[in-house]
Amino acid sequence: MSKIAKTAIISPKAEINKGVEIGEFCVIGDGVKLDEGVKLHNNVTLQGHTFVGKNTEIFPFAVLGTQPQDLKYKGEYSELIIGEDNLIREFCMINPGTEGGIKKTLIGDKNLLMAYVHVAHDCVIGSHCILANGVTLAGHIEIGDYVNIGGLTAIHQFVRIAKGCMIAGKSALGKDVPPYCTVEGNRAFIRGLNRHRMRQLLESKDIDFIYALYKRLFRPIPSLRESAKLELEEHANNPFVKEICSFILESSRGVAYKSSEYSSEEKQEE
Protein backbone atom coordinates (compact mmCIF):
# COMPACT_ATOMS: atom_id res chain seq x y z
CA MET A 1 0.00 0.00 0.00
CA SER A 2 1.31 3.44 -0.91
CA LYS A 3 1.86 6.14 1.72
CA ILE A 4 1.08 9.60 0.37
CA ALA A 5 1.18 12.84 2.36
CA LYS A 6 -1.97 14.95 2.28
CA THR A 7 -0.05 18.04 1.19
CA ALA A 8 1.42 16.34 -1.89
CA ILE A 9 0.07 17.59 -5.23
CA ILE A 10 -0.32 14.65 -7.60
CA SER A 11 -1.78 14.71 -11.09
CA PRO A 12 -4.60 12.20 -11.63
CA LYS A 13 -2.73 11.17 -14.79
CA ALA A 14 0.39 10.13 -12.86
CA GLU A 15 0.91 6.39 -12.31
CA ILE A 16 1.76 5.48 -8.72
CA ASN A 17 2.61 1.82 -8.09
CA LYS A 18 2.18 -0.06 -4.82
CA GLY A 19 4.46 0.58 -1.88
CA VAL A 20 5.37 4.11 -2.96
CA GLU A 21 6.00 6.78 -0.31
CA ILE A 22 5.41 10.43 -1.21
CA GLY A 23 6.35 13.05 1.37
CA GLU A 24 4.95 16.43 2.29
CA PHE A 25 4.66 19.10 -0.42
CA CYS A 26 5.84 16.92 -3.31
CA VAL A 27 4.61 17.85 -6.79
CA ILE A 28 3.98 15.03 -9.30
CA GLY A 29 3.08 15.92 -12.89
CA ASP A 30 0.92 14.28 -15.57
CA GLY A 31 3.40 11.94 -17.25
CA VAL A 32 5.21 10.66 -14.16
CA LYS A 33 5.37 6.93 -13.41
CA LEU A 34 6.66 5.63 -10.07
CA ASP A 35 7.46 1.94 -9.77
CA GLU A 36 7.14 -0.19 -6.63
CA GLY A 37 8.92 0.94 -3.50
CA VAL A 38 9.92 4.40 -4.72
CA LYS A 39 10.37 6.85 -1.84
CA LEU A 40 10.08 10.61 -2.26
CA HIS A 41 11.05 12.74 0.70
CA ASN A 42 9.37 16.11 1.20
CA ASN A 43 9.42 18.85 -1.45
CA VAL A 44 10.42 16.69 -4.42
CA THR A 45 9.24 17.85 -7.87
CA LEU A 46 8.75 15.35 -10.72
CA GLN A 47 7.49 16.59 -14.08
CA GLY A 48 7.36 15.55 -17.73
CA HIS A 49 7.49 11.97 -18.97
CA THR A 50 9.55 10.71 -16.05
CA PHE A 51 9.83 7.08 -14.99
CA VAL A 52 11.42 6.18 -11.64
CA GLY A 53 12.37 2.53 -11.10
CA LYS A 54 11.85 0.26 -8.11
CA ASN A 55 13.17 1.25 -4.69
CA THR A 56 14.77 4.47 -5.86
CA GLU A 57 14.88 7.10 -3.12
CA ILE A 58 14.76 10.83 -3.88
CA PHE A 59 15.58 13.40 -1.22
CA PRO A 60 14.18 16.89 -0.52
CA PHE A 61 14.18 19.63 -3.15
CA ALA A 62 15.33 17.42 -6.01
CA VAL A 63 13.77 18.51 -9.31
CA LEU A 64 13.47 15.88 -12.05
CA GLY A 65 11.94 15.95 -15.51
CA THR A 66 11.42 19.67 -15.99
CA GLN A 67 12.14 21.14 -19.43
CA PRO A 68 15.73 20.74 -20.62
CA GLN A 69 17.93 23.82 -20.40
CA ASP A 70 18.40 23.99 -24.15
CA LEU A 71 17.23 26.98 -26.18
CA LYS A 72 16.45 24.68 -29.11
CA TYR A 73 13.85 22.79 -27.08
CA LYS A 74 10.33 23.63 -28.28
CA GLY A 75 8.22 21.36 -26.11
CA GLU A 76 8.64 18.16 -28.12
CA TYR A 77 8.09 14.78 -26.45
CA SER A 78 11.07 13.57 -24.43
CA GLU A 79 11.69 11.29 -21.48
CA LEU A 80 13.66 10.84 -18.29
CA ILE A 81 14.12 7.18 -17.35
CA ILE A 82 15.67 6.28 -14.00
CA GLY A 83 16.43 2.68 -13.04
CA GLU A 84 16.19 0.78 -9.77
CA ASP A 85 17.78 1.24 -6.33
CA ASN A 86 19.18 4.71 -6.96
CA LEU A 87 19.80 7.35 -4.31
CA ILE A 88 19.21 10.91 -5.55
CA ARG A 89 20.12 13.41 -2.87
CA GLU A 90 19.04 16.94 -2.04
CA PHE A 91 18.75 19.63 -4.73
CA CYS A 92 19.66 17.37 -7.65
CA MET A 93 18.36 18.45 -11.05
CA ILE A 94 17.92 15.95 -13.89
CA ASN A 95 16.51 17.03 -17.27
CA PRO A 96 14.87 14.87 -19.97
CA GLY A 97 16.18 14.50 -23.52
CA THR A 98 15.74 16.65 -26.61
CA GLU A 99 14.97 16.29 -30.30
CA GLY A 100 18.61 17.07 -31.03
CA GLY A 101 19.79 14.11 -28.96
CA ILE A 102 18.37 10.68 -28.16
CA LYS A 103 15.08 12.20 -26.89
CA LYS A 104 15.67 10.77 -23.43
CA THR A 105 17.97 10.95 -20.44
CA LEU A 106 18.85 7.54 -19.03
CA ILE A 107 20.12 6.57 -15.57
CA GLY A 108 20.82 2.94 -14.72
CA ASP A 109 20.63 1.08 -11.40
CA LYS A 110 22.28 1.43 -7.98
CA ASN A 111 23.75 4.88 -8.53
CA LEU A 112 24.38 7.57 -5.92
CA LEU A 113 23.89 11.16 -7.01
CA MET A 114 24.93 13.36 -4.10
CA ALA A 115 23.56 16.82 -3.35
CA TYR A 116 23.44 19.50 -6.06
CA VAL A 117 24.32 17.15 -8.92
CA HIS A 118 23.10 18.42 -12.30
CA VAL A 119 22.42 15.98 -15.15
CA ALA A 120 21.54 17.79 -18.37
CA HIS A 121 19.50 16.62 -21.36
CA ASP A 122 20.29 13.42 -23.28
CA CYS A 123 22.86 12.14 -20.78
CA VAL A 124 23.30 8.39 -20.32
CA ILE A 125 24.61 7.14 -16.97
CA GLY A 126 25.27 3.44 -16.40
CA SER A 127 24.95 1.55 -13.11
CA HIS A 128 26.93 1.51 -9.85
CA CYS A 129 28.19 5.07 -10.36
CA ILE A 130 28.86 7.73 -7.73
CA LEU A 131 28.56 11.41 -8.61
CA ALA A 132 29.73 13.45 -5.63
CA ASN A 133 28.34 16.79 -4.47
CA GLY A 134 28.11 19.50 -7.09
CA VAL A 135 29.03 17.43 -10.14
CA THR A 136 27.77 19.12 -13.31
CA LEU A 137 27.11 17.17 -16.49
CA ALA A 138 26.41 19.11 -19.68
CA GLY A 139 24.20 17.61 -22.39
CA HIS A 140 24.74 14.38 -24.31
CA ILE A 141 27.35 12.94 -21.91
CA GLU A 142 27.79 9.16 -21.68
CA ILE A 143 29.06 7.53 -18.49
CA GLY A 144 29.73 3.80 -18.20
CA ASP A 145 29.24 1.50 -15.22
CA TYR A 146 31.29 1.78 -12.01
CA VAL A 147 32.42 5.36 -12.59
CA ASN A 148 33.24 7.70 -9.68
CA ILE A 149 33.22 11.46 -10.22
CA GLY A 150 34.60 13.71 -7.48
CA GLY A 151 32.81 16.76 -6.14
CA LEU A 152 32.55 20.07 -8.01
CA THR A 153 33.67 18.50 -11.28
CA ALA A 154 32.33 19.96 -14.52
CA ILE A 155 32.14 17.89 -17.72
CA HIS A 156 31.76 19.28 -21.25
CA GLN A 157 28.87 18.23 -23.49
CA PHE A 158 29.27 15.06 -25.58
CA VAL A 159 32.13 13.71 -23.42
CA ARG A 160 32.22 9.93 -22.98
CA ILE A 161 33.56 8.31 -19.81
CA ALA A 162 34.05 4.55 -20.04
CA LYS A 163 33.61 1.81 -17.48
CA GLY A 164 35.58 1.86 -14.24
CA CYS A 165 37.00 5.40 -14.46
CA MET A 166 37.71 7.81 -11.62
CA ILE A 167 37.46 11.57 -12.15
CA ALA A 168 39.10 13.54 -9.33
CA GLY A 169 37.25 16.35 -7.58
CA LYS A 170 37.28 19.93 -8.91
CA SER A 171 38.28 18.71 -12.36
CA ALA A 172 37.19 20.26 -15.65
CA LEU A 173 36.93 17.51 -18.24
CA GLY A 174 36.55 18.24 -21.94
CA LYS A 175 37.71 15.02 -23.59
CA ASP A 176 36.85 11.31 -23.54
CA VAL A 177 38.22 8.90 -20.93
CA PRO A 178 38.91 5.24 -21.87
CA PRO A 179 38.12 2.32 -19.54
CA TYR A 180 39.68 2.13 -16.06
CA CYS A 181 41.54 5.44 -16.27
CA THR A 182 42.02 8.02 -13.51
CA VAL A 183 41.70 11.65 -14.56
CA GLU A 184 42.47 14.89 -12.72
CA GLY A 185 42.97 18.59 -13.38
CA ASN A 186 41.70 21.66 -15.19
CA ARG A 187 41.85 20.76 -18.01
CA ALA A 188 41.79 17.16 -16.89
CA PHE A 189 44.15 14.53 -18.27
CA ILE A 190 44.70 10.83 -17.60
CA ARG A 191 47.07 10.38 -14.65
CA GLY A 192 47.10 6.60 -14.45
CA LEU A 193 44.76 3.63 -14.03
CA ASN A 194 42.06 3.07 -11.44
CA ARG A 195 43.69 0.25 -9.52
CA HIS A 196 41.00 0.11 -6.84
CA ARG A 197 38.15 -0.44 -9.30
CA MET A 198 40.16 -2.85 -11.45
CA ARG A 199 40.84 -5.07 -8.44
CA GLN A 200 37.12 -5.14 -7.69
CA LEU A 201 36.06 -6.05 -11.22
CA LEU A 202 38.92 -7.98 -12.83
CA GLU A 203 41.21 -10.93 -12.28
CA SER A 204 44.89 -10.21 -11.68
CA LYS A 205 45.95 -11.61 -15.06
CA ASP A 206 43.50 -9.30 -16.82
CA ILE A 207 44.75 -6.32 -14.82
CA ASP A 208 48.32 -7.11 -15.87
CA PHE A 209 47.24 -7.37 -19.51
CA ILE A 210 45.44 -4.01 -19.39
CA TYR A 211 48.43 -2.31 -17.78
CA ALA A 212 50.71 -3.61 -20.51
CA LEU A 213 48.20 -2.57 -23.17
CA TYR A 214 48.00 1.01 -21.91
CA LYS A 215 51.79 1.28 -21.73
CA ARG A 216 51.95 0.34 -25.39
CA LEU A 217 49.12 2.68 -26.33
CA PHE A 218 50.55 5.66 -24.46
CA ARG A 219 54.01 5.62 -26.01
CA PRO A 220 54.93 8.93 -27.71
CA ILE A 221 55.36 7.20 -31.08
CA PRO A 222 53.22 6.16 -32.91
CA SER A 223 50.17 8.29 -32.15
CA LEU A 224 47.46 7.03 -29.82
CA ARG A 225 45.06 6.32 -32.69
CA GLU A 226 47.72 4.50 -34.72
CA SER A 227 48.67 2.43 -31.67
CA ALA A 228 45.02 1.51 -31.13
CA LYS A 229 44.68 0.38 -34.75
CA LEU A 230 47.81 -1.77 -34.46
CA GLU A 231 46.59 -3.37 -31.24
CA LEU A 232 43.25 -4.25 -32.82
CA GLU A 233 45.02 -5.84 -35.76
CA GLU A 234 47.32 -7.91 -33.55
CA HIS A 235 44.82 -8.84 -30.80
CA ALA A 236 41.51 -8.86 -32.66
CA ASN A 237 39.94 -11.51 -30.43
CA ASN A 238 40.90 -10.07 -27.05
CA PRO A 239 37.86 -8.45 -25.39
CA PHE A 240 39.90 -5.85 -23.49
CA VAL A 241 41.72 -4.73 -26.63
CA LYS A 242 38.38 -4.43 -28.42
CA GLU A 243 36.82 -2.48 -25.57
CA ILE A 244 39.69 -0.04 -25.02
CA CYS A 245 40.96 0.45 -28.56
CA SER A 246 37.50 0.72 -30.11
CA PHE A 247 36.65 3.40 -27.55
CA ILE A 248 39.76 5.37 -28.52
CA LEU A 249 39.09 5.08 -32.24
CA GLU A 250 35.43 6.05 -31.88
CA SER A 251 36.20 9.17 -29.85
CA SER A 252 34.92 12.34 -31.51
CA ARG A 253 36.27 14.76 -28.90
CA GLY A 254 39.66 13.13 -28.54
CA VAL A 255 41.07 11.31 -25.51
CA ALA A 256 42.10 13.15 -22.33
CA TYR A 257 45.70 12.01 -22.69
CA LYS A 258 48.98 13.87 -22.44
CA SER A 259 52.14 11.76 -22.43
CA SER A 260 53.99 13.74 -19.76
CA GLU A 261 51.02 13.70 -17.36
CA TYR A 262 50.42 9.95 -17.61
CA SER A 263 54.04 8.84 -17.42
CA SER A 264 54.91 11.01 -14.40
CA GLU A 265 52.05 9.60 -12.36
CA GLU A 266 52.78 6.02 -13.36
CA LYS A 267 56.43 6.37 -12.34
CA GLN A 268 55.38 7.64 -8.94
CA GLU A 269 53.00 4.70 -8.47
CA GLU A 270 55.61 2.18 -9.55
Swiss-Prot record:
Keywords: Acyltransferase, Cytoplasm, Lipid A biosynthesis, Lipid biosynthesis, Lipid metabolism, Repeat, Transferase. Transmembrane segments: none annotated. Its main location: cytoplasm. It catalyses: a (3R)-hydroxyacyl-[ACP] + UDP-N-acetyl-alpha-D-glucosamine = a UDP-3-O-[(3R)-3-hydroxyacyl]-N-acetyl-alpha-D-glucosamine + holo-[ACP]. It is found in: Cytoplasm. Its EC number is 2.3.1.129. The keyword 4Fe-4S does not apply. One of its GO terms (biological process) is lipid A biosynthetic process. SUPFAM superfamilies: Trimeric LpxA-like enzymes. InterPro entries: Acetyltransf_C, Acetyltransf_C_sf, Hexapep, Lipid_A_LpxA, Trimer_LpxA-like_sf. Pathway: Glycolipid biosynthesis; lipid IV(A) biosynthesis; lipid IV(A) from (3R)-3-hydroxytetradecanoyl-[acyl-carrier-protein] and UDP-N-acetyl-alpha-D-glucosamine: step 1/6. GO terms for molecular function: acyl-[acyl-carrier-protein]-UDP-N-acetylglucosamine O-acyltransferase activity. NCBIfam families: lipid_A_lpxA, PRK05289.1. Involved in the biosynthesis of lipid A, a phosphorylated glycolipid that anchors the lipopolysaccharide to the outer membrane of the cell. Belongs to the transferase hexapeptide repeat family. LpxA subfamily. Homotrimer. This is Acyl-[acyl-carrier-protein]--UDP-N-acetylglucosamine O-acyltransferase. It comes from Helicobacter pylori (strain ATCC 700392 / 26695) (Campylobacter pylori). The gene is lpxA.
